[in-house]
A protein has these predicted regions:
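Noncatalytic, solvent-exposed loop/strand surfaces
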Residues: 1-187
Length: 187
């Protein structure tokens, strides 16, 4: 499928990317998919969505900041899959949590701190490369994902037909906000 351009000058992007016949890839994010605990949180998420680069799944990293969706947790990077070869079925837990990334020129990266460890979140130094990258989940100001639930599924696929046969959503918020006297309409 066609892939977006717009990488930094030192990088290369292919004009197309391969896709699988059986895909758990989510539809592209839209501004109306932005969500928040409060209307103000949702507004800030929409502002951030429009501030960051995002042209779909293969949007290249940028100095401005980029939405990575599906993010670093997957679709199946963390949840993995199980296959029953006799019945030709596959079960997995696709995760659809958006991340953000922002390239950092080598000259702007602070010296490595003692005991500093690599992580899925924060600064990835990319030693030897001209840029590091700051990565993390795409969260609102209240540290809740900016995209509306669900953030993933438990799913099964029929490998003989290449079709998703069953999905159950994960990442829902119950209709209460804990001990706060505020009702949350997302279920």
């Amino acid at each position: 499928e066609p892939a977006p351009k717009g990488a930094i000058p030192e990088d290369f992007t292919a004009p197309t990317q391969p896709t699988s016949a059986l895909s758990f890839s989510p539809p592209p994010l839209r501004e109306r998919d932005m969500w928040g605990i409060t209307i103000f949180d949702q507004l800030m998420c929409r502002i951030d969505f429009n501030r960051l680069n995002y042209e779909g799944r293969y949007t290249p990293p940028s100095l401005k900041g980029t939405i990575v969706y599906p993010g670093n947790f997957g679709t199946f990077n963390w949840g993995s899959i199980a296959v029953d070869p006799q019945r030709q079925v596959m079960f997995g837990m696709p995760t659809y949590l958006a991340f953000t990334s922002r390239l950092v020129p080598r000259a702007d990266i602070p010296p490595k701190g003692e005991g500093e460890k690599a992580s899925e979140q924060g600064l990835n130094r990319n030693e030897g490369a001209p840029y590091g990258v700051v990565m993390g989940p795409f969260l609102g100001k209240l540290k809740v994902p900016c995209q509306a639930p669900p953030w993933g599924y438990v799913a099964g696929a029929d490998l003989t037909t290449g079709q998703i046969a069953w999905k159950h959503r994960n990442g829902t918020v119950r209709p209460t906000a804990g001990p706060a006297p505020v009702r949350n309409a997302v279920t």
